[in-house]
Amino acid sequence: MEESHFNSNPYFWPSIPTVSGQIENTMFINKMKDQLLPEKGCGLAPPHYPTLLTVPASVSLSSGISMDTESKSEQLTPHSQASVTQNITVVPVPSTGLMTAGVSCSQRWRREGSQSRGPGLVITSPSGSLVTTASSAQTFPISTPMIVSALPPGSQALQVVPDLSKKVASTLTEEGGGGGGGGGTVAPPKPPRGRKKKRMLESGLPEMNDPYVLAPGDDDDHQKDGKTYRCRMCSLTFYSKSEMQIHSKSHTETKPHKCPHCSKTFANSSYLAQHIRIHSGAKPYSCNFCEKSFRQLSHLQQHTRIHSKMHTETIKPHKCPHCSKTFANTSYLAQHLRIHSGAKPYNCSYCQKAFRQLSHLQQHTRIHTGDRPYKCAHPGCEKAFTQLSNLQSHRRQHNKDKPFKCHNCHRAYTDAASLEAHLSTHTVKHAKVYTCTICSRAYTSETYLMKHMRKHNPPDLQQQVQAAAAAAAVAQAQAQAQAQAQAQAQAQAQAQAQAQAQASQASQQQQQQQPPPPQPPHFQSPGAAPQGGGGGDSNQNPPPQCSFDLTPYKPAEHHKDICLTVTTSTIQVEHLASS
């Protein structure tokens, strides 16, 4: 006897169910296939359900396996019931073929000897033609087609046409009703011509082998961008399948690549290398036009647009509606619009401060966390910084590069902040009025004083700072009081000077108001009336004239006094001479 294509090893065969159970399973499978796979063609292979085999004796060994149903039923059907049997004719077929058999439930009582005959096994060849056997040893009172796989275990799954069982059942019914027996060849329906289209399930998801390819509707949305691969977890789209697979590892796989400088981990070594450039400050991508360098190639490509010969509107097509600035992409425009609107969507979780840019929030968060990702790579230097600009300024100290020079004294500094602090010493406006209470050092601003106080590291810095502020306030109040006292003293001195001036003026006025002294008899001032007698004689004596002409040297009043003195002396001399 030839070996059957079915595996005869009972180890690979599960327990054989009853005929009623097989019929229920078959009806359930056909129902589920009608619901889930409404279209022709399916990418899912049906499961193989072992059946109860009853091989008739009329089939020869060359075309199949012959066995009497009544005599061999006990050998092949140890689990079957005594009153119900299932009859399937098995014919050897190539391993790529498909067998469709009519499964019948024959209510056969042993006391009845008559059986109705029907068509036997139906086989589909690899070319697609249906072959029915003309065996008369089968019993098909009720024709319920069932799919039986003829492949050995481990073979490739077969493509099953869902409606094939119904068509075979109708064919068997017509042939059985027409005369009961003859076999024939039934041609399957021709497949539709043209390119195969993606089959859609009722749930709306496309049925395809590659889970990363976009659906037809999504292809239309991303046709302009050229992104045909989408992540199933976060719906991001990518240009190539490799990029999407690398991205998908962030959702499903672990991140074995850890940064040696911080606690971040990455799923790909390329992402880790790109992240390490942040700590090292390396910028391997340089611009050929302006010699600027960038950490990522995409940043260099975006920067190269500035040097392009295209028009400015083409390079920066996105224009701000509030001002005349233009931008190369929408993200830069959205970031710029926050300046006009005042929106600050990024909030600090520690102090509730808000920022317009995410990078500003990240820099601010490092103040609370103490993270210093920018470390100096100079041998023997272990300094780290929160910002890249601070690291670049620190590197100039190792290189002895001091590009910031003072135009007054020609001193040079490594950064602009140091130069600005130095320039304040050349101006009177920025005087060093903030003095340290511990070492008496003075600074131009309170911020510098606070930084200096941290170096002393006192046990209670805040109290000392408050005491210093109170002492400064007291000193300022005392200075104001002294200034007020000086102002009052000056006012008093001015008042005294004014009083003295007024007194001198009053004394001068009193001296001017006193009457002149009496004159001698023989001296008459010019214009005086003659002495003596009668009223109105025409002979008037001329006034005596002074023999001393002192007019060029003295004014009239002093001249009068001198004349009186000289006259008195003359009278005395004459009196002495006469005596």
Curated annotation (Swiss-Prot):
GO biological process entries: nucleocytoplasmic transport; positive regulation of protein secretion; positive regulation of transcription by RNA polymerase II; regulation of transcription by RNA polymerase II
Entry-linked SMART domains: ZnF_C2H2
GO molecular function annotations of the record: DNA-binding transcription activator activity, RNA polymerase II-specific; DNA-binding transcription factor activity, RNA polymerase II-specific; RNA polymerase II cis-regulatory region sequence-specific DNA binding; RNA polymerase II transcription regulatory region sequence-specific DNA binding; sequence-specific DNA binding; sequence-specific double-stranded DNA binding; SH3 domain binding; zinc ion binding
Superkingdom to which the source organism belongs: Eukaryota
Alphabetized InterPro entries for the sequence: Znf_C2H2_sf, Znf_C2H2_type
One Gene Ontology cellular component annotation held by this UniProt entry: nucleus
Biased composition (Gly residues): 175-185
Compartments in which it is found: Nucleus
Entries under PANTHER family matching the protein: BLOODY FINGERS-RELATED, KRAB AND ZINC FINGER DOMAIN-CONTAINING
Protein's name according to its UniProt entry: Zinc finger protein 384
Gene name linked to the record: Znf384
